[in-house]
Amino acid sequence: MELALITAQQVAVLFLLIGTGMVAVKTGVLKLENKQALSNLLVYIVVPAMVVNSYRMEFSAQILHNLLAAFGMSVLSVLLGTVITLLFTARKTGSRMPIFRFACIFSNAAYMGFPLISALFGSEGLLYASAYVTVFNILLWTLGYGLVSGGSSVKEVARSLVRTPVLYAIVVGLGIYLLQIPLPTLITQPLELLAGVNTPLSMLITGMLIAAGDVRSIVTDKHIWKLASVRMLLIPAATLALFGVLGFHGTAAQVVTLLECCPAAAITSVFAVQFGHDEHFAAGSVVLTTLLSIVTLPLCALIITMVM
């Protein structure tokens, strides 16, 4: 119950930050074309700094064990979501299906998940979240890229992975953690300051995305509601059930499960534009699932604390 209340409070805070982003766009303080630059700042600088900073803790064999377990649980959860999505859409065709499948499988772990995990579980939770994001990125740029591009070469996939900065941040962070490398204040202070930017910046970007969408047309689109039911209800419930059957519990399991409860990945819209898919459907999927998460995330946290 305590985790659910903290989650509800944190989601409310995130929603206020999202609202700030929406107001900033509506009043002209921020332009929609600024979204890509802010997103690049987040992905290439802020999130990597936050990941490296999260590894700055005293070595613990138990935490290392939990970290390795988090990697395994992350692989299991994302693959489970993939199987569920492919089964759900097995007999469905249409131009929206690539985006439908992608948005169901891949959650907004970085934008929505990291701020939430940081607030609920602190640095240890971020360690386990970084394990999830590592698995997430590898599958996103292989399986996910293939889903929306209609097939991709090994060279294209490798190039995409090499351009994923958070993977380098995890390697550096792991090195610092395992070798217990002391960092000077000149390095740690900028890392901490940049890490602190993650939550407000990611929520401002989410608010800008919502401001750009037509909420009325989004909430009347039955296909987006079907997508939301898979992304926000079916996959989290299946993950929770599977982890319960396998006896997974503790902070690492809670973190991975909560990340699976997050809305559709913001990059869904980017891929829709890049590969000529229905970008309004993609943006609508992100917007609706993000709005629904204001209610569903606290409920998921409540259930997680009851069974894990």
Task: Report residues per predicted region.
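Alpha-helical transmembrane segments of multi-pass small-molecule/ion transporters
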Residues: M1-M308
